[in-house]
């Protein structure tokens, strides 16, 4: 059994893999619009961004919902034969990705691999007219992933 010692602490100043904050939790669901409606009306989350057929996304719909410092992403596939569709059919609605804000995506990616993590997406930058985002992903438990942002 794993035992954690109270005196065994990672020194923040020396650990290059320090997580600064949680960025988001992404749920893969059967109906993103319905899930967004629920989170807005039942739990008080506000929609802050979306991607769907209306924005040119022909693979899936996603809604970013925010309340205070909490940010969730609700995504649903248009096709059951896609990766997202197959995952949703197998597992039902649930968490797919946990986004972690780190100081340096490249360093966090490399250090996680050095510590035994399985890399999925190497450091990648995406951008559009609204800005850019650098991220990398690693495999964790089951089919859930962690995304360094």
Where are the language model's segments positioned?
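Conserved oxyanion/phosphate-binding beta-strand-loop segments in alpha/beta enzyme cores
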Residues: 1-10, 63-81, 145-149
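Core segments of cupin and vicinal oxygen chelate
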Residues: 3-7, 17-71, 114, 123-129, ...
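Catalytic micro-motifs at enzyme active sites that drive phosphoryl/nucleotidyl and oxygen chemistry
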Residues: 12, 51-54, 83-88, 99, ...
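Vicinal oxygen chelate
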Residues: 20-30, 63-64, 83-110, 115, ...
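Short helix/loop capping segments that flank catalytic or ligand/cofactor-binding pockets
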Residues: 37, 83, 109-110, 146-148
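C-terminal catalytic ATP-binding subdomain
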Residues: 134-149
């Amino acid at each position: 059994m794993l035992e954690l010692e109270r005196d065994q602490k990672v020194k923040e100043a020396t650990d290059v893999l320090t997580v600064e904050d949680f960025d988001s939790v992404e749920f893969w669901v059967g109906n993103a619009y319905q899930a967004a409606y629920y989170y807005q009306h039942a739990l008080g989350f506000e929609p802050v961004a979306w991607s769907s057929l209306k924005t040119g996304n022909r693979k899936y719909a996603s809604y970013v919902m925010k309340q205070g410092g909490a940010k969730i992403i609700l995504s649903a596939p248009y096709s059951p034969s896609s990766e997202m569709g197959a995952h949703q059919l197998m597992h039902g609605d649930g968490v797919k990705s946990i986004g972690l804000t780190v100081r340096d995506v490249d360093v966090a990616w490399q250090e996680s691999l050095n510590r035994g993590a399985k890399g999925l997406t190497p450091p990648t930058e995406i951008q559009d007219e609204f800005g850019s985002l650098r991220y990398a992903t690693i495999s964790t438990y089951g089919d859930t992933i962690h995304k360094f942002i």
